[in-house]
Design a protein with these regions (language model features):
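Tryptophan (W) side chains
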Residues: 10-12
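Solvent-exposed loop/turn segments at secondary-structure junctions
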Residues: 79-80, 98-101, 116-120, 153-155, ...
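An acidic, glycine-rich "communication" segment
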Residues: 187, 270-366, 428-452
Length: 452
């Protein structure tokens, strides 16, 4: 099931998500339905083999697609041996924050069961590894604060030790597949600044190829389009930053991508993420990810640019825009700020998008009426079950030389901090650190590594 998506694979992934935004999936052709049945039979065989190999539960990277992501306080813990090598560990927890999930509110108490195996560290089963806490098998103890990624119901959740339990600070997944604008250089730089300011933990996932067995290769390859380094790690993130360009991710990789981008979690985009995917073919799923995903997420799509050699003048924001946390403390002179990014032309934004910065083409070849375009905007989309709105921020800036400017660096960090609700961390000291951070442009930067 690895490799690049084919058209017939798409209805399967859409039906699996159960997303009403994809009505085309429910009118799939007979060819697509046949592929679904074939995939289903393959999954049954796969799971039967796993059962015979005494794999009692699915690995956490599958459960991470389930509908619960919570921040909790542990009230109690109890170990209950199930077999000679399997122990159920029951936690009683109190909900502090609901990121994803229905039927739960802040203050609710519920049970969480985790299975611990006596596998040695590094065994094939993920449960043989240790979690980040000091309890049994790295699980949290009484009084600990933790994040839960779990399946189950609003009364009893089930997860797998230790991957379903994470430290309470947020994790942002940076997805860097834009080879044209060297996201392998710019995104690690931004991710480091985010982590150093204590805004969130970060991971960077680079473009790579397929290992030939349906999984991503381990080493970055920015010319490849079908894989992401540590793509399963996306499922442990609770927000994402995209710097993508025309990716053609495989089936497993798209499952991971959807887990962090299709559940109302915060999402931030740079530059070519207006055209994040470039799947071949004209199937319903192909069209949705290529064309509808950017519109549904960012509110618009890429149309063209005002000349590849042109630049953009960032227009000084008005007083109302300056009061937004994304632009707090950002200094754009009255005459504007010229940056190397060419100006992108986009379709008109919907009313729920709030433009914070406009740009004007410098030495561009756009028609006069289109030489002024939005270059940074935010939106908040409502969510069900009383959850806070999804925060989304996008900028068409992102040329690697843009980040030589301290104000572009600052607004980039503040976009992310606002999206995940951590804008209060951006004080004057933090802004000074970001402005004075050393940035190496691509021409002197070493190649991307898995751990930037």
């Amino acid at each position: 099931m690895g490799g690049r998506f084919r058209d017939r694979d798409w209805p399967w992934i859409q039906l699996g998500q159960g997303d009403a935004a994809h009505p085309g999936a429910y009118g799939a052709s007979m060819r697509s339905m046949k592929a679904i049945l074939v995939s289903f039979v393959a999954l049954v065989i796969e799971h039967s083999q796993a059962a015979r190999a005494e794999q009692p539960v699915a690995p956490m990277w599958q459960l991470a697609e389930a509908p619960f992501q919570l921040e909790v306080t542990v009230l109690s813990m109890e170990e209950k041996p199930l077999t000679e090598r399997i122990t159920n560990i029951w936690h009683r927890v109190k909900v502090k924050r609901v990121f994803v999930g229905s039927g739960l509110s802040v203050g609710d108490e519920l049970a969480v069961v985790s299975q611990v195996f006596d596998n040695p560290p590094g065994a094939t089963s993920s449960s043989g590894d240790r979690g980040p806490f000091n309890g049994p098998n790295g699980l949290p103890a009484k009084g600990d604060h933790a994040r839960i990624f779990a399946n189950g119901s609003a009364k009893v959740l089930k997860t797998i030790s230790p991957n379903g339990w994470q430290l309470p600070d947020q994790m942002i997944a940076f997805i860097a597949t834009d080879d044209e604008y060297r996201s392998d250089v710019t995104m690690p730089f931004i991710a480091k600044l985010i982590a150093r300011q204590g805004i969130a933990r970060t991971s960077v996932h680079f473009s790579t190829g397929d290992d030939g067995r349906g999984s991503s290769a381990k080493e970055p390859d920015m010319k490849a389009r079908t894989g992401l380094t540590d793509d399963l790690g996306l499922r442990r993130a609770d927000s994402s930053v995209l710097a993508m360009r025309r990716s053609e991710l495989g089936y497993n990789q798209m499952n991971s991508f959807a887990s962090v981008t299709r559940h109302g979690l915060p999402i931030v985009g740079f530059r070519n993420s207006l055209q994040a995917f470039g799947f071949p073919g004209d199937g319903e799923g192909t069209k949705w990810w290529n064309d509808a995903f950017p519109v549904e997420t960012w509110g618009t799509r890429w149309r063209s640019q005002c000349g590849r050699q042109s630049k953009t003048r960032i227009v000084a924001p008005d007083a109302e825009a300056r009061r937004h946390p994304v632009l707090s403390g950002v200094s754009i002179p009255a005459e504007g700020l010229v940056v190397p990014s060419s100006l992108f032309r986009v379709d008109p934004l919907p009313p729920d998008c709030r433009v914070l910065l406009w740009g004007e083409a410098v030495d561009g070849d756009c028609p006069e009426a289109e030489r002024r375009q939005p270059i940074l905007w935010v939106r908040e989309l409502p969510r069900k079950s009383g959850l806070p709105p999804q925060r989304i921020a996008f900028t068409s800036l992102g040329h690697p030389a843009d980040f030589l400017d301290s104000e572009v660096r600052l607004l980039s960090i503040q976009m992310i901090a606002w999206a995940i609700g951590e804008e209060a961390r951006m004080d004057d000291a933090a802004r000074l650190t970001i402005r004075t951070a050393q940035y190496l442009p691509p021409e002197v930067q070493p190649p991307a590594t898995v751990k930037p």
